[in-house]
Amino acid sequence: MTYEEIYSQFYSKETDPTFFKKYSKDEAYELMKDWLHSIVAIPFVRKCFSTITLDDEILELKFQLKNSVDEESDNYFVKNLFAHGLKICCMQKQIDTSVSLATVIGAKEEKTILNNYKNNELRLEQLEIQFRKFIRDHVYINNDYIGEE
């Protein structure tokens, strides 16, 4: 599976238009490539795979799922898994920017420029929960103990 396939899936999920305006294509691809490595390093993600290799030279992901269904279903699962992970990484980067943490000193009290930090944190937490549920459901449904009916 190519990185481009994963990036395309991410683009369909990303709703923040500033991401596409903020970075050139090369900058965005470099950033997303780093995020892919971060996602693979997450223990509950890594545990889904028997083998997984990110080849940055040819921009390709090679993998074998532990609970494989068939090639097409596995590809859909992996694309969605990494696209969701990229969305989380992107949101984390937005939350950690200096603008969202900035305060303005005015008159007698501090005021925040935009007080949506807490809402963004809650949204990020929801995305992470959905991410874990997505993995959990895949592993549970395709686990050998349930068997086929």
Write out the residue ranges for each language-model feature.
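Amphipathic alpha-helical coiled-coil segments with heptad-repeat character
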Residues: 81, 88, 110, 114-117, ...
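Polybasic, proline/glycine-rich intrinsically disordered low-complexity segments
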Residues: 115-149
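Elongated alpha-helical scaffolds
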Residues: 75-95
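Generic hydrophobic, helix-prone segments enriched in Leu/Val/Ile
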Residues: 10-13, 75, 91, 120, ...
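Short E/K-rich amphipathic alpha-helical oligomerization segments
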Residues: 56, 98-110
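Short, solvent-exposed secondary-structure capping/transition elements
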Residues: 48, 90-102
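Conserved short "hinge" loops at termini or chain/domain junctions
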Residues: 1-74, 137-149
